[in-house]
Amino acid sequence: MTQFASPVLHSLLDTDAYKLHMQQAVFHHYYDVQVAAEFRCRGDDLLGIYADAIREQVDAMQHLRLQEDEFQWLSGLPFFKPDYLNWLREFRYNPAQVCVTNDNGKLNIRLTGPWREVIMWEVPLLAVISELVHHYRSPNAGVDQALDALESKLVDFTALTANLDMSRFYLMDFGTRRRFSREVQQAIVKRLQQESWFVGTSNYDLARRLALTPMGTQAHEWFQAHQQISPDLATSQRAALAAWLNEYPDQLGIALTDCITMDAFLRDFGIEFASRYQGLRHDSGDPVAWGEKAIAHYEKLGIDPLTKTLVFSDNLDLPKAVELYRHFASRVQLSFGIGTRLTCDIPQVKPLNIVIKLVECNGKPVAKLSDSPGKTICHDKAFVRALRKAFDLPQVRKAS
């Protein structure tokens, strides 16, 4: 299946902010590290028939480059260094790093190459896959249907929050990777800009064009890669946390907690990290239990939770965000990142549950265990066992 009308992507910045944040850190600290990453469809969708169309889009991505106005805009942000931005100016996607195949109906994608380059593929490639699939499956759906669905949800949201003090409720768009289309994401974000509680987007292109705050810090791959970069597996998570502070000592300080598990993370998140990081991000497991653990941890360390921020971003929708806000608002600062339930929430359209995750670093396995067993990713069961042993976790979950 080929011949999509035109390139899906129009800007190198059409990606999530944390990709550039991590890329700069990799550029400065791990320039020669090599990685491999793989695509996973967590649902039962047979996406292999789209392999040729995806390959065409991958080839088209080599023509994307940082434009002068984009370079100038990034230069005005406080956390990017000139050496990195000058390098990014010359960056081009290399399609040879991407192998796309149709394996009896199953879509296989493997990415290999220097981490500083491979890191850029994940988000735009997932957005391409999502848009292509929805273009063929739902040709009559689009912006109008997405906005109608959003308006209905906003009516319900207004009723749900009528008696709530919403002055500390902050919502972000995290919807790039599984969006229905680029046009739908832009329309949704532009509509949400009218709401006082909407504070930004993870998409750098939209943030620039719509004068929004770009949102994001780091992803699982930052912690995964350190499992092989660090000489000691048991201290790899602490090494990742320390390296991030080395690159961003006073900014972008929200730490992702579930690469191993929340309990393992908190054992590593002592006073030296907890005092310097601005907060934590939830991405798997029970969000209420996670939030209670985070607050208790801060209190145990003598840190006032109201000086810290908890970011919730796992499978959220507006009602779930309100429920969490009701539970935690008086005890800690809060932000909510909603993705698929904003940018691909259209009647009769089934969103894709797709990811691209790191599987190797410098030729050796890495793993994501998470607080949700179904999200475990690793080929090497022996490495998963070693990881669980290093972090004092029971040997119960299997790698997928």
Curated annotation (Swiss-Prot):
GO cellular component annotations of the record: cytosol
Alphabetized InterPro entries for the sequence: N/Namide_PRibTrfase, NAPRTase_N, Nic_PRibTrfase, Nic_PRibTrfase-Fam, Nicotinate_pribotase-like_C
Annotated HAMAP family: NAPRTase
Catalytic activity field: nicotinate + 5-phospho-alpha-D-ribose 1-diphosphate + ATP + H2O = nicotinate beta-D-ribonucleotide + ADP + phosphate + diphosphate
GO annotation terms (biological process): NAD biosynthetic process via the salvage pathway
Pathway connected to this protein: Cofactor biosynthesis; NAD(+) biosynthesis; nicotinate D-ribonucleotide from nicotinate: step 1/1
Protein name: Nicotinate phosphoribosyltransferase
EC identifiers of the protein: 6.3.4.21
UniProt entry tagged with the keyword Phosphoprotein: yes
Coiled-coil parts of chain: none
Family membership: Belongs to the NAPRTase family.
Modified residues (Phosphohistidine): H220
Post-translational modification as stated in the protein's UniProt record: Transiently phosphorylated on a His residue during the reaction cycle. Phosphorylation strongly increases the affinity for substrates and increases the rate of nicotinate D-ribonucleotide production. Dephosphorylation regenerates the low-affinity form of the enzyme, leading to product release.
Stored Gene3D superfamilies: nicotinate phosphoribosyltransferase
Pfam name, any one: NAPRTase
Alphabetized UniProt keyword annotations: Ligase, Phosphoprotein, Pyridine nucleotide biosynthesis
Gene name in the database record: pncB
Function: Catalyzes the synthesis of beta-nicotinate D-ribonucleotide from nicotinate and 5-phospho-D-ribose 1-phosphate at the expense of ATP.
GO terms of molecular function: nicotinate phosphoribosyltransferase activity
